Amino acid sequence: MTLQTTPSTPLVQDPPVPATLVHAAAQHPLEQLSAEEIHEARRILAEAGLVGESTRFAYLGLIEPPKTTRQGDVTGAARLVRAMLWDAAQSRSLDVRLSLATGLVVDRRELNPEADGQLPVLLEEFGIIEDILSEDPQWNAALTARGLTPAQVRVAPLSAGVFEYGNEEGKRLLRGLGFRQDHPADHPWAHPIDGLVAFVDVENRRVNHLIDDGPVPVPEVNGNYTDPAIRGELRTDLLPIEIMQPEGPSFTLEGNHLSWAGWDLRVGFDAREGLVLHQLHHSHKGRRRPVIHRASISEMVVPYGDPSPYRSWQNYFDSGEYLVGRDANSLRLGCDCLGDITYMSPVVADDFGNPRTIENGICIHEEDAGILWKHTDEWAGSDEVRRNRRLVVSFFTTVGNYDYGFYWYLYLDGTIEFEAKATGIVFTAALPDKDYAYASEIAPGLGAPYHQHLFSARLDMMIDGDANRVEELDLVRLPKGPGNPHGNAFTQKRTLLARESEAVRDADGAKGRVWHISNPDSLNHLGHPVGYTLYPEGNPTLAMADDSSIASRAAFARHHLWVTRHAEEELYAAGDFVNQHPGGAVLPAYVAQDRDIDGQDLVVWHSFGLTHFPRPEDWPIMPVDTTGFTLKPHGFFDENPTLNVPSSAAGHCGTGSEREHAAPGGTAVGHSGPDTGGQGHCGH
């Protein structure tokens, strides 16, 4: 969802490149698509008669080679591309696969929109909805009754979902909510136009249905958070923080192969999923071992809990409907990323199938992570401390009113974390009254409906190989008895999840529930299977009724854990075609096969997220809120793998009152230099 008529990064197309250059250099099969390859893919589709003036590219991305092929790392392997093409003139959605090596289309399928759903929302459609409504007599009459003109109103183009409204089957729809904009730099979210919503047929460029319950007072608060009248004087008590690595970072990046402190992986990027981490390995004591074959956030959904007719349909799949990778930001040194930064600039296709480079779209850096381990021992006369650090691979995306950061962290001790950072502006509404049960009052007369941000991580596990299993670990309290006379005993219960039907599970904080993923064919020096443990946050799952439309379409969010047998085609938690899909498929359909997952090649799907009851402090712009999960080695190593981490350099762990500062002067290319609190550096 967005008010922008263009994505956060300008639509600057890369120049065409002769097709002969596409295969000039050997590539790893998991390299990101290049601008040359996107040009070539478009040429192949055009020569096949699949691209005309009315054709739009809803998605274009790399088809990753099969898992067995990837293990061989065959350089120069055939590159396959998937394209989702929408032709408005023919009312036709195509799912096409092509080979860059042969220059041929290898498969095509026409979608049935009623059964299969629609292709993702186009960037072009963000602006179309305002054009359609500005020419609609009913919409204009509704604005006139509110003392407004179309020129004063911005319309949020919002995915439609699937509901019981009549005359919608098979149509490509968006729903539009209006916001008054008082001047070009005004933030319209402060002025929601309530009591009015338009259901727009973007294919036929007409209003399908309009709900207008008459004028509602438009909130008059100021939402311009950079306005000195709102923010006040900039504070002067924040002294600079300098992040310096005079010898450079400890990681290396060659192509998309990233190595750091025993870790190595390949960094991928997809217009739909954003960051994709491939082939995560860890090396320790001369042994390189696989941990995860592929890790991504396969879907995220933002369902709203307001039952009013203007908002009861608000459920946004930001990955499957809006493509979080396509909407990624270009990051700025010292603002989005701080320290010695290495950037990657992924390339995506625009609506016309031309490549668009997202300059500095991926940020890679390492950062201090506090104490790694520490102990003062009077018996041994020792006092040892080591500092931790982590490798950070991240990107930020803007999807309408919200901005999301996707952060993958790798630690020295083998820990893997994912963190989502939610910020931006909460979706607003005119508050019916102060006691309204489904929204918070965040400013006088301004409400923010309750909602959730729910994510699905797809983790294609490969702990020491493909033979993996999952066990559920619960704390068990024991009653007093002959074996527990003081009542202090507790133990841990291990439950094997042997089949897919047994592996649909929920977190339980009262039991300290975690899930242990192990390889029964690979034993550590204690004779136990090597493994990793998934630690969930245990926040609420999908809050909507079980028989609601969104519960069917976002079934992945109804449980914290799903485990499936690996299948190449099972990539997305909410399905391939999420936009206006009726639901009832995907993860529940996967587990309905009830495949054996004990000692098999398996995929762990972890649902997590935030339930947001907005606060006044979330207005006019929301401080970052976070959610995520942790994977910790559990029997994967024979002992603490960080014993070989050296202590900090001499003079850095002193006990005096000295303060050390880096020498003054300029900063090297790729360094952010001092953080000055952002004054004049990260704003406009």
Curated annotation (Swiss-Prot):
Topaquinone (TPQ) is generated by copper-dependent autoxidation of a specific tyrosyl residue. Substrate binds at residues 316-327, 399-404. GO terms for cellular component: cytoplasm. It is an enzyme of class 1 (oxidoreductase). Its cofactor is Cu cation; Zn(2+); Ca(2+); L-topaquinone. Residues 647-684 are annotated as: Disordered. Mn(2+) binds at residues 460, 601. Residues 675-684 have a biased composition (Gly residues). Homodimer. This is Histamine oxidase.
